[in-house]
Amino acid sequence: MSCLAALTKFHEIYKAAFVERLGELPRCFTHGRPSPCLADDALAGSEEPQPWQMVPRREVAVFNNVSHAMDIELHHDIDDFYGHLFGGPLQFDSPWGEGELIQIWNEDDFVLLQQNILGHLMMKKQLKQPQTWFVGLIGDVDEMVSVNNADGTVWREVAGQEPHEQLAESLEAFLQQLKPRVAPPQYHQEPAATVNPHPGIFASLKRMWQNLTGR
């Protein structure tokens, strides 16, 4: 099974868990942002959490611009994980605790993601640490779930530090160990002076970026 197949399967299991437990699709706060994955009866401008479901992209999105800017070859799993689907945040339970996978809400989300991954890679280079890129958060202190770009292994990582605990041999293997966490959507209040939050990234990137930059 590929990373994309494992991610698609988790989306399907995630949706089924919400339908079985709550009788409805997963919901998230949209912050007024449209998305292809909003359900037909969803209201993007509503302040209430709206139902969503995974939608395949018509064209695969890639990270060639980030690779070119850093003059490195990014591990192919990054395109599998981020480039094929639109979706909301995926909350999970795992052998290592609760967490959240970052997913792409809309095209603006993808641009923001590229900027944040580029910033993360630049920070790792500056610190002379192994190159990693993130796929989510885990634990109570917003540790990152990151992928070692050299070999595709999945790690637990604190922003600005080297990865400190290997979680899986691959992103595919990591995804297969997750279980959907059926829980109410979380609302992250953003300071008025910051950029509007993107629900697909669900404020996770902003928290990580603040950790990386100290702002």
From Swiss-Prot:
It is found in: Cell inner membrane. Coiled coil: none annotated. Keywords: Cell inner membrane, Cell membrane, Membrane. It is a peripheral membrane protein. Pfam families: Syd (PF07348). One of its GO terms (cellular component) is cytoplasmic side of plasma membrane. Gene3D superfamilies: Syd protein (3.40.1580.20). Interacts with the SecY protein in vivo. May bind preferentially to an uncomplexed state of SecY, thus functioning either as a chelating agent for excess SecY in the cell or as a regulatory factor that negatively controls the translocase function. Belongs to the Syd family. This is Protein Syd. The gene is syd.
